[in-house]
């Protein structure tokens, strides 16, 4: 049976360090604070918002939610962003995506202060990653993949890595991050021909396509390390990933579960970035 790469163990280790750092900030009368901007009332957004708030509360990180109409004018959004950028007590800003179609994504992302951009949405922060500089904020989900591999002592140097996702949220930044660790990377997507023949040759496969249990054992070899980023709902209403876990777990070397995998680390890294920002801005 495959080694199960539990993300909650990784998250727990990060939180232990955060507790110490937050305690030191409190001694200076600094309370880390996150501003969340949500446009509309999509159930997925509201659920994610509640999850973030709950996680923040456990570590004594303050949150402020700005509930905005989906038809908000770009001018009004930018005024709000300017106000949050100038608030000394607000250390991190997170804007839920995707944005309403009438808003210019590049303009919105560029409006976030670089030192408060805790999910690396600003083009200049992303550009830094594409230049190989991993010292600042990184997108939380790709960073979670790296942290899980690091925790379980999986060296990326020389590894062949296949990423099934080409978005700016996961696939593209993650590809640059693993390149910085001297891996060889292949990006696949919905138009890739004969995907199993590509993934089967890889040492590590990262999938983030959002299709419940689509990926079966024929995509992997017996030594494959499988990182399942997606959180889907199966036909029985249960959370699952892109990979059919029960079908695959006996056939590969290691695999992350869903839940208790990448998602738990992603949220914890958001908290870490808020604390990082509070320390830098203090």
UniProtKB/Swiss-Prot annotation:
SUPFAM superfamilies per UniProt: Aminoacid dehydrogenase-like, N-terminal domain, NAD(P)-binding Rossmann-fold domains
Entry-linked Pfam families: THF_DHG_CYH (PF00763), THF_DHG_CYH_C (PF02882)
Family statement drawn from the similarity comment of this UniProt entry: Belongs to the tetrahydrofolate dehydrogenase/cyclohydrolase family.
GO molecular function, one term: methylenetetrahydrofolate dehydrogenase (NADP+) activity
Summary of subunit composition and partner proteins: Homodimer.
Protein name as catalogued: Bifunctional protein FolD
Coiled-coil region: none
Keywords on record: Amino-acid biosynthesis, Histidine biosynthesis, Hydrolase, Methionine biosynthesis, Multifunctional enzyme, NADP, One-carbon metabolism, Oxidoreductase, Purine biosynthesis
Protein's organism: Clostridium botulinum (strain 657 / Type Ba4)
Gene Ontology CC: one annotated term: cytosol
Gene3D superfamilies: Leucine Dehydrogenase, chain A, domain 1, NAD(P)-binding Rossmann-like Domain
GO biological process: L-histidine biosynthetic process; methionine biosynthetic process; purine nucleotide biosynthetic process; tetrahydrofolate interconversion
């Amino acid at each position: 049976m495959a080694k199960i790469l539990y993300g909650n163990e990784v998250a727990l280790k990060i939180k232990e360090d955060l507790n110490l750092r937050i305690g030191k900030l409190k001694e200076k009368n600094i309370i880390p604070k996150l501003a969340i901007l949500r446009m509309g009332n999509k159930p997925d957004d509201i659920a994610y918002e509640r999850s973030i708030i709950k996680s923040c509360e456990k570590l004594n990180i303050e949150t402020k939610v700005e509930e905005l109409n989906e038809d908000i004018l770009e001018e009004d959004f930018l005024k709000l962003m300017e106000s949050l950028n100038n608030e000394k007590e607000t250390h991190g800003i997170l804007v839920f995506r995707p944005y309403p179609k009438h808003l210019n994504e590049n303009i919105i992302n560029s409006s976030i202060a670089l030192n408060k951009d805790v999910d690396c949405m600003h083009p200049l922060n992303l550009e830094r990653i594409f230049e190989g500089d991993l010292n600042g904020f990184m997108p939380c989900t790709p960073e979670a993949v790296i942290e899980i591999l690091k925790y379980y002592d999986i060296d990326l140097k020389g590894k062949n890595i296949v990423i099934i996702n080409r978005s700016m949220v996961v696939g593209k930044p993650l590809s640059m991050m693993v390149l910085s660790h001297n891996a060889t990377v292949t990006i696949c997507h919905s138009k890739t021909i004969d995907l199993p023949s590509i993934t089967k040759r890889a040492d590590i496969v990262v999938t983030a396509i959002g299709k419940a249990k689509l990926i079966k054992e024929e995509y992997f070899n017996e030594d494959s390390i499988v990182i399942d980023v997606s959180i889907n709902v199966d036909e029985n209403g249960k959370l699952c990933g892109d990979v059919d876990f029960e079908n695959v777990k006996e056939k590969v070397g290691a695999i992350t579960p869903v839940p208790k995998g990448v998602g738990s680390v992603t949220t914890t890294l958001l908290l870490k970035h808020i604390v990082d920002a509070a320390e830098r801005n203090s």
